[in-house]
Amino acid sequence: MKTVIFDVDGVLLSEKRYFDVSGLVLWEWYNSPLFLGIGEEPVIAEPTEEKIEALRRHYWADDELLRRFKRHGINSNWDMVYLFAVCSFLVAAQGDANLFRGLSADFSTSPALRKLGTALRRRAFAVPSGRRVLDLFETLVPEDTKKDDVFFLVDKALSGATAAVFAGQLGLHGTLWQSLFACFQN
């Protein structure tokens, strides 16, 4: 017996909706008290179409960041959301070299995420726009870099900029990725 598996998320939802959901996931992960809870904006269960479009524009830089990821062979929305999060921490670390000093990042449980979120909020961490993430990504990742090397380069840059703060948390299917995946499934 042979088994055939079809990936139909994009077919059923449309690619547009799938990327809308990715923006919503980032919004929830950064702002909801179930996750980091660092934003002042409350997460609502049924945002308007205008809000969804605004979030997508904000996080994905009018889709330029999504297109850039896809050119590198990154097609999974879970992976794209992970890359955004890693790059957002790196943008923040470049803006304030002491931001992560003394912190211990733990993405493995909701209480640990909230603790990290509280510490980041106290240190005035601000989620960067998709444009800032795109600018950083373009400086880190050469145009001809393939998928696996993209993750290596971005994770290495964050590890270097934040010392051991994110040790053991990065990488595909690491605890940061799993936390974002859980938010996606929420």
PLM regions with names:
Residues 1-61, 79-82, 89:
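Active-site neighborhood of HAD-like aspartate-dependent phosphohydrolases
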Residues 55-186:
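A metal-dependent, Asp-based hydrolase signature
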